Amino acid sequence: VRAESTVATQKYVWKNVKIEGGGGFITGIVFNPKEKNLVYVRTDIGGAYRSTDGGNTWTQLMSWVSFDEWNLLGVESIATDPVDPNRLYIAAGTYTNSWTNMNGVLLRSKDKGNTFERTPLPFKLGGNMPGRNMGERLAIDPNNNSILYLGTREGNGLWKSIDYGVTWKKVDSFPNPGTYIEDPNCPNDYLNHITGVVWVVFDPSSGKPGEGSKVIYVGVADKNTSIYYTKDGGQTWEPLPGQPTGLLPQRAKLSSDGMLYITYSNTQGPYNGDYGEVWKYNTKTREWKNISPMPAKDTYFGYGGLAIDAQNPKVVMVAALSSWWPDTYIWRSTDGGETWKCIWEWAGYPNRTLHYTMDISAAPWLNFGITSPVPPETSPKLGWMVATLEIDPFNSDRMLHGTGATLYGSDDLTKWDRGEKITIKVKGIGIEETSVAALVSPPVGPHLFSAIYDIAGFRHDDLEKAPSWTYTQPNMGSTTDIDYAELNPNFMVRVGNVDKKWNP
């Protein structure tokens, strides 16, 4: 019998099915202050991404994570080194509750995230827990980049590394690990956890290169005392005198002229919060000032995203975290928060004057099938859950802001100051962080149909292009499964979750 030749094994080439735009919550944006165009984003379930073109396109840095280590894909915080741009740190861990038994991991890279070394941490991290919108919890001392601080949850306090993140030790002198718990009686073990230490900000002017910074500010989820500072490089700590009470500090930034800006909400977020304020603290005169852009009586949301223009410390931007209707708010000030301009304003209800145009051509599905919006709403929206907002330190015209669905941005930001409209574009090209429940590929018709949590799913006519629309008839936020009839592939069924309050 003549032996048959062995059939060669076909080699497969794997690529992402393009969705573009992200499809999930962008929880943090961090520009490197030393290397132009280098920027990172973190997500709650989709890992971390790097851009080397200022945020136009992105590369996934955590595709190496195995199924067994799925918990690493929730990124609690991210830090890019202000001294050595090649160094990158990621605090990885998705849940601090009973949904996983995995502790967090500190990922260390010397090549901008191409490869990582890891340090196991003795506690859990919460990249997809309530308060993931706050930050950044992980920070590098600009006067000694071997020193890092990490704010943690669950009463674990503030931690410090003096060897580039290789080893960590708890800062025993730090007095407050946080007290805030949104709902102590939460039945599903999600809202009943301590939010903890939520951000760390160094004062570069308080030290010399190589010696470390003397002054450090730390934010804590505690409505009584939420901001602490040290004047001796972390040996002793005390509350910052005169600080606001009754609110939780979301984000903080220190401008080059010595102003500490803080956004506040009355809850941890990211979904809720019906009141907030914006404050600035003059670190030279030790004076506080409420610079909230909206009067207290009109505020129905908490504040989140915060940005300062590195080229002009008087330029400050803030965003509403929890304004869902009619849209989010973004404000811009060119005088240190004394006066503000909003990106839209009322023009006699239900009309609004918009100082921007939206371009979603890179991800047309971001209108979520709403082609004839009813005023005052528009489609697409500017966003929701805007926890992070950044101005490129090398380009005052470039802004990025994260939402619950995508990453948006502008390349003509300073037009706003001249009374002209700016353009907001999809900037999440390469970010794919959807939670896919099911896939089917019928023998005829489109290549692929997806069932996806939160954004319904898609008919993928071209795997190399973003879909034009999500499933809308009926409109289900999450599609949990999808299938077709074998004998009639054009007959398809999908099932999912519907919120009867919004879709009666």
Task: Describe the role of every protein-language-model region.
Residues 1-504:
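Extracellular glycan-interacting surfaces
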